[in-house]
Amino acid sequence: MNKKIDNKRVGFHSIESIIKNSPHKIKKLFIPQSRDDKRINNLIALAEKNGIKYQVSKKLKQEPEAEITNENNLSFQDLKIFLEEKNNKKLNILILDNIIDPRNLGACIRSAAVADVDALIINKHHCAPLNDVAHSVSSGGAEYVRIFFVSNLVNCIKYLKDLNISIFGLSEHSKTDYDQADFTENTAVIMGSEEDGIRKKTQESCDSMIRLS
């Protein structure tokens, strides 16, 4: 089943990031009537500066909400075009496989944004939806990272290998520590769920397995 991107955003970090980076995405902004403080006033000022109209809502308690335009998921074909344009640049890619909790997905996106990865690839059929919960936990990170959804991760990994991108899978059972791996060339790191890790087929496609500690 295709995982759709939710068109609602909740929370200051997520909404502020959209206004700063892609204000055209916001269709409606809702402000909680119960708040009249510096943070909410700063958000209103930021919205007005970018020509975004807002509406005061009695239903909201503490956090603002925004309705954004429908987004089309970036696909494997989009990834190919993106990588072709980056052919002279050293690449650092994060791949998510088997992340089933939206909160964990959001945390991974936030980490990817902080680490300044070039692309985040998500296994579309084996991952949590990129909904408002994931966006909220990501603290706006989704606005800073190129996110691609692929339906066949094994084929995607094969394509990355053909581009001379080394594939490292994370596993607590590996005997090789993260700091022992060679990240001087183009690399992609695959991360799975805390409980089960990455799927067996995905592991078999990796060049090597490494552990974080």
Q: Where does each model-flagged region fall?
A:
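N-terminal positively charged helical leader segments and presequences
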Residues: 1-86
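Short acidic active-site motifs
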Residues: 14, 39, 152-156, 177-179, ...
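RNA substrate-binding interface of SAM-dependent RNA methyltransferases
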Residues: 17, 24, 31, 52, ...
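Short glycine-rich anion-binding loops that position phosphate/pyrophosphate groups of nucleotides
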Residues: 35, 60, 70-72, 100, ...
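Short, glycine/polar-rich helix-capping loops at beta-to-alpha or helix-loop-helix junctions
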Residues: 39-40, 127-133, 196-205
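General small-molecule cofactor/ligand-binding pocket signal
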Residues: 53-57, 148, 210
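Short basic, glycine-rich beta-strand/loop surfaces that mediate nucleic-acid
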Residues: 61-71, 138-142, 184-192
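Active-site/ligand-binding-proximal alpha/beta "capping" segment
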Residues: 168-213
